[in-house]
Amino acid sequence: MLLVLTGVTAISVALLAYVNELTKEPIAQANAKTLSDAVSAVVPGFDNDPIAEKKTQEVNGVQYAVYPATKEGKFIGAAVEATSMGFGGELKVLVGFDAEGKIIDYSLLSHVETPGLGSKAADWFKKGNKGDITGMNPGEASLTVSKDGGKVDAITASTITCLLY
C-alpha cells in the first residue's frame, strides 16, 4: 500500500513539474503583453519603449517599478507599478502620470479581492465614475478616502482596497 501511494505521489509530482515547465513561457508572455497593453493605456502617446527603460524607485522603503514615457525625446509621463496587500490578498496596480504628476489613468494588473466588492476597484476610480481620481496629483494632495477627510469616494464595504490607491 505504501509503495502504491509513493508511486502515485512521484508520478503526480513529475506531471505537475512537466506541466509547470510547459506553461512557464506562455504565462510569462501573457504577463508581458498585459503589462505592455496597460502601459499604453495609462500613458498614451509615447514613442519610446517604457518597459525596456524601466527604472526602480524606492520611496519610504517600498520599491516601485517606473516606466518612463517620452515622445520625440521629451518626457511626457510615466507609468508606476505598485503592489500592496488588499483585504483579500495582493493587489498590483499600474498608474499613469503626466509630466506634471497628475494621474492620467490606471490599470489593475492583478488582484484577489472579493468579487462584487473589492474587485470593483478595476473601474471605480476611472474617469467619469464615482471614485474618479484622474487629474489628481498625489504630490499636491494626499489621495485619502472621504471617510478619512479626503476627496476620494471609497467603494462601499471595500475601504481597505480603496486605501491602497
What are these regions (language model features)?
Residues 1-164:
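Flexible, solvent-exposed loop/hinge segments and secondary-structure transition points
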